[in-house]
């Protein structure tokens, strides 16, 4: 399978026209003979890519005071918890924020407020924030998320996930694609790409 994936990546690189931006690589996976109407059969996995995503991941954190300064030091955008209620009342602004960031983190005391006011926007996009305990440095979580991609099938038999960018080498892209393939095949036995 590794050779097939490597050949597919090579073919995509050779056949792609020249662009004025750094292209991402996506893998399309089609499931066969799987009933996705049953939520147990759906795939929802976070895969840590061995060679990273090839692009910077945008992370935001709902935090105040001390945790906010730690987050800023780690390069994480900080959203003031006082604005959560205002964002919840302005759906357009909340959607814009959800589109702007790849992952969200939150201090534990703010999780309920985020769920109440922004859950309608963040939940369906799979972007509900991960809780950060007060003893944990948000930089550790952010470093892990920099090389993480989400594989989510929902109720569709064909789904896509990003696994790298044009700036990465063939071996890095192949390793990333194989990591996703291995994780998905461990969840299901009947898969065709």
Residue positions per predicted region:
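OB-fold/S1-family RNA-binding modules
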Residues: 1
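Interdomain regulatory linker/hinge segments that flank or connect interaction modules
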Residues: 7-15
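Translation machinery proteins
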Residues: 15-67, 90-91
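Residue-level preference for alpha-helix termini and adjacent loops
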Residues: 24-30, 42, 46-48, 78, ...
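Long, charge-patterned amphipathic alpha-helical coiled-coil/hairpin "stalk" segments used as oligomerization
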Residues: 83-187
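Conserved small/polar residues in nucleotide/adenosyl-binding loops
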Residues: 191-193
């Amino acid at each position: 399978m590794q050779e097939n994936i490597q050949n597919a990546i090579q073919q995509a690189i050779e056949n792609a026209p020249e662009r004025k931006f750094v292209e991402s690589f996506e893998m399309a996976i089609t499931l066969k003979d799987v009933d996705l109407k049953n939520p147990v059969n759906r795939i929802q996995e976070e895969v840590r890519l061995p060679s990273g995503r090839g692009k910077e991941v945008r992370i935001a954190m709902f935090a105040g005071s001390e945790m906010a300064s730690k987050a800023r030091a780690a390069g994480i955008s900080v959203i003031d918890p006082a604005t959560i209620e205002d964002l919840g009342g302005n759906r357009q602004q909340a959607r814009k924020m959800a589109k702007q960031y790849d992952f969200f983190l939150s201090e534990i005391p703010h999780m309920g407020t985020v769920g109440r006011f922004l859950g309608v926007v963040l939940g369906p996009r799979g972007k509900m924030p991960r809780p950060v305990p007060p003893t944990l440095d948000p930089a550790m979580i952010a470093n892990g998320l920099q090389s993480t991609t989400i594989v989510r099938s929902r109720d569709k038999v064909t789904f896509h996930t990003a696994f790298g960018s044009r700036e990465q080498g063939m071996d890095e892209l192949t390793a990333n694609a194989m990591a996703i393939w291995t994780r998905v095949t461990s969840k299901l036995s009947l898969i065709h790409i």
